[in-house]
């Protein structure tokens, strides 16, 4: 494998292995899985039984679309911590959707809600004296020593953050781009919705607007690891 360097230019992407090799890799993994099942006596080796059942509800109360995929159809998986927005996450989610469509599989994003947040501040670009600067806008009072799935968001702070962002950028078009934030605020008001679910609701809303559809979503905290480890 060559030495990899993170791209520095605007809009540049790094793929390894090259994207054109991905369908062949999916097929190779599928064959290996079937061969392993045969060697082990044909046991059902699904590592994620939850994928074959009704998945947890979305933050807005509607159920996530359940994944009912047969043993020989691939599930293309990506994942990341729950953050308000992250270009790298969107790129990965768009790519797994494209790859899943190409190989007849299902695209799945794992929400890593068991990690603690690094910050409760949005980095917002602003122009000061004709020069680009970055302002910090606090959107929550999250603890950095506690998993996101164990915390909740305050709707008043979320609304205040949206107003501050618009006041900072001084650009109506960019303010309209904050429309997905309404999904975060709405989700945060749902009983039992944790911070990771609420933040993910905004990302999911943005992806639905851009793609017209969304990937399957599962939170890591809800995966049945105990059952998997017993197999």
Question: What label would you give each PLM region?
Answer:
Residues 104-173:
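Compact, glycine/acidic-enriched structural inserts
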Residues 172-231:
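Aromatic-residue-lined binding/catalytic grooves and analogous aromatic/hydrophobic interfacial grooves
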Residues 17, 80-91, 187-198:
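Conserved aromatic-histidine-acidic binding/catalytic patches
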Residues 66, 84-87, 116-120:
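Short active-site-adjacent helix-start/loop capping segments
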Residues 71-103:
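N-terminal catalytic cores of NTP/NDP-binding nucleotidyl/phosphoryl-transfer enzymes
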Residues 1-82, 132, 156-170:
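N-terminal regions that are enriched for targeting/export leaders
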Residues 79-82, 110-115, 219-223:
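An acidic- and aromatic-residue-enriched active-site/binding cleft used to recognize and process polar
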Residues 56, 76-78, 107-110, 137-139, ...:
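Generic structural hydrophobic/aromatic packing signal, biased to beta-strands
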